Amino acid sequence: MAFKIATPQIRFASPGPQPNGLQAAPDGLWCIDQVDNKIYRQDFETGEVLFEAQTDTVHSSGITLGGGYIWIASTYESKIAKLDLVTGKTVAKYDSPGAGVVAWREDAVDAQSTGAHGLEWRGGLLYVASPPSQMIHVMNPENWTEVNRFPSGGLRVHGIAWGPRGRLWVSDTSSGTVQLMETEHGRIFETIRVEAPAEVHGMTIYEDVLWYCDAHSQQIGCLIV
């Protein structure tokens, strides 16, 4: 079969009103909220909030950890923010690669330029999912140059998470899918359809299980395949 079907299993509610980005780490589940723009770190089992901090990001849609920092996609200012891991204070901000008007808003009179959604880190590089460009941009954070890009495989890319063999899980909220892609050209190896009404906004992987957050329902859960 060319696809699988995932059943969302709700684990707990996010402490913020609209969770929009997730990152699993040994010390807990990190989340960025797009309304209060706070970062939260929760216990995987209970959902207990272990840490929270207010950020100066705007309508944020992605979070990851790497190089000793927190990275956040500050979507509505088209920036990628680099934050102190202990305090949550912004250290620097960089232009979001692929920023622009998303395809489904191009003809709207009030169309607004926006930036990235999901983020991931590997090998000293930052992987940035951009709905406006419909690409995954691979950035060198040392000099903020793009070293590669590949198609995201859909209309509205959102969360991303590392899969097996160095491949990347990529969610698309317009099609309700999660696809496993290689990171040079974007070749797709697997597609998972996510049962409605859940939408995979933020996404991460913990103990070989994909976790997601849904900004519409405020829920955080797992995808059971």
Spans of features found by a protein language model:
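Blade/loop signatures of beta-propeller domains
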Residues: M1-I5
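A short beta-strand motif characteristic of beta-propeller blades
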Residues: T7-A13, E48-A53, K89-Y94, A99-V109, ...
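Beta-rich, blade/repeat-based domains predominating
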Residues: A13-P26, D56-G67, P97-G123, G153-R165, ...
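Conserved beta-strand positions in repeat-built beta-propeller and related beta-rich domains
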Residues: P15, C31-D36, I72-S78, V128-S133, ...
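Short loop/turn segments that connect beta-strands within beta-propeller blades
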Residues: D43-G47, D84-G88, N140-W144, E182-G186, ...
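Blade-level signature of beta-propeller repeat domains, shared across WD40, Kelch, NHL, RCC1
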Residues: V200-V225
